[in-house]
Amino acid sequence: MALAGAPAGGPCAPALEALLGAGALRLLDSSQIVIISAAQDASAPPAPTGPAAPAAGPCDPDLLLFATPQAPRPTPSAPRPALGRPPVKRRLDLETDHQYLAESSGPARGRGRHPGKGVKSPGEKSRYETSLNLTTKRFLELLSHSADGVVDLNWAAEVLKVQKRRIYDITNVLEGIQLIAKKSKNHIQWLGSHTTVGVGGRLEGLTQDLRQLQESEQQLDHLMNICTTQLRLLSEDTDSQRLAYVTCQDLRSIADPAEQMVMVIKAPPETQLQAVDSSENFQISLKSKQGPIDVFLCPEETVGGISPGKTPSQEVTSEEENRATDSATIVSPPPSSPPSSLTTDPSQSLLSLEQEPLLSRMGSLRAPVDEDRLSPLVAADSLLEHVREDFSGLLPEEFISLSPPHEALDYHFGLEEGEGIRDLFDCDFGDLTPLDF
């Protein structure tokens, strides 16, 4: 190693060489040495050199050596550490549940974790079982089973197997929101809902009522299905269409005429019906946009009289009853009777309301008919042929036909104050002789 930074033959060079030769200094090849020496007096003799040289006296120069520290040179096989980062001391082991393990594990410092800590014993309760939420639910369940809503807190703590202070925590909250009230020190009463007292019996009764309603609903659905099937067969079956009619006797057999009034409603399709059932009276509202609505009264059959559904009877006392007879007429005649057509034109009405008292005294107008067999009403012309002789003394010789007959839509219009019934028909009533009664 060469010395640099000092002139050759300087006073410090021999001393430094002596130190290096003796092995007193261990320097590397890359070490740098800085030598600082003090000035020497020129009159002083030179100091001897060599290992046996005496120590320098007060006049000897001071020699200060400074070496720059250097890190050891890395070997070519070792990886060079990254600048600014500490060397990696851990590695990732994916086979040990993603845990970082040290390369060399030393003895654990401090107190180690007990191996049995965190493992619950079989008899230990979970956190949810001891929670206040579950305890409150169980306490309210005890309140619901109480007959009068009063619960002893000591008994509740024993049943729930919890500390009494937790029962007090629950009761304090419930008392604060006015759901319970303290009867005494250890007794509380439920005030939230009085329906909870004895709710089991009421629940059983309501369940039974619901079961009965479901059975009734199923029975009604079954009857509605039967009626729907019968109506479809009645309207679609050819053999059943000829029997699609109803008589006054059928209507009177449904209800007692002495206590109930039977009314027949003849309405066009798509008629809206609204019924209001109140405690005082019963109201029915009908509304139709397709045509007029006819309402007929089914009269009560008197003793010795004949049903209006068989032949015209003198028992009919109003125009509504005459119209009820028309509605009860057979739509299609049975096979035993000859086919005939029924018309409801005003020209075929027999008598007015003023002539009916006279007919009531004429017993000959009653034609004998079979009570067991029903026949449709015949036309007015055929009836006049049978009773023409009986009317000879009371009525004119001929009836005037009111023509042309009006249709259903013609009755939607009314008459003015100066018009009468003759203005509805194109005929002359001047030749008619007034009837004197």
Curated annotation (Swiss-Prot):
Residues 42-87, 101-128, 300-349 are annotated as: Disordered. Residues 192-382 are annotated as: Required for interaction with TRIM28. Changing K185R: Abrogates methylation by SETD7. Loss of interaction with L3MBTL3. Loss of ubiquitination by the CRL4-DCAF5 E3 ubiquitin ligase complex. Residues 67-108 are annotated as: Cyclin A:CDK2 binding. The keyword Nucleotidyltransferase does not apply. Residues 89-191 are annotated as: Interaction with BIRC2/c-IAP1. CDD domains: E2F_DD. Changing K117R: Abolishes acetylation. The keyword Acetylation applies. Keywords: Acetylation, Activator, Apoptosis, Cell cycle, DNA-binding, Host-virus interaction, Methylation, Nucleus, Phosphoprotein, Transcription, Transcription regulation, Ubl conjugation. Changing T433A: Decreased phosphorylation by GSK3B. Changing S403A: Decreased phosphorylation by GSK3B, leading to abolished interaction with USP11 and subsequent deubiquitination. This is Transcription factor E2F1. The gene is E2F1.
